[in-house]
Amino acid sequence: MSCATPVDAAVELHLFACDECGARLGEIISLAEGIRDLARRGSLLLVVSDTFVDRLVEEGLRVRQYAPPHGGSIACTVTAEDDVLIGRLSADLSRAKRVDLCLCNEWHIERIRLADIPFDPAADAVLFQQSITYAKAAPSETTIAKLLAVDEAGGERLLGEFTFHHTRTLPGPGAP
């Protein structure tokens, strides 16, 4: 064994000796691999890093990215060949302690909130992966992404608002 601490060694010994705990660990590993696979296939909505996006490109995946101007909008779509869909939201994150990403409909009604997202205060943007599975099946629609700084008391300050005008181009249910 090459465990770093005595606690690690004790846990490892237990996992090898206890079939039930070993089986549970196997289930957790399978779950983690499944989540990683969904993320790599672009099927999850999550915050990602430039490094993650670069790795996907290096692996040969077709990554479609949209970066609407701060406070502005952008027309967007996906094709059958796209593997991953990334939104790049520029904002001054330097004074934020906590950031939430809200996805709203065209009437500014919040549909999804990713609370306390990972971010780098020195970065000039937050990158999020929209589910490519959803984007390929979605009807033409408008989504407004809002980055909010949230203080300790729960107060919110708008860091940026970005509008995505999605046009469906793939045939199927929901197509025009």
Where are these predicted regions, by residue range?
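Short, amphipathic alpha-helical interaction patch
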Residues: 1-17
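Charged, amphipathic alpha-helical segments
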Residues: 82-85, 127-133
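Short, aromatic- and glycine-rich surface loops/edge beta-strands on solvent-exposed regions
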Residues: 99-102, 134-160
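Solvent-exposed serine/threonine-rich low-complexity stretches and specific carbohydrate-binding patches
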Residues: 106-130
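Short beta-strand elements
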Residues: 151-176
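Short alpha-helical interface segments
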Residues: 15-63
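Solvent-exposed loop/turn segments flanking beta-strands in beta-repeat/beta-sandwich domains
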Residues: 93-105
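Contiguous beta-strand segments within globular domains
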Residues: 68-95
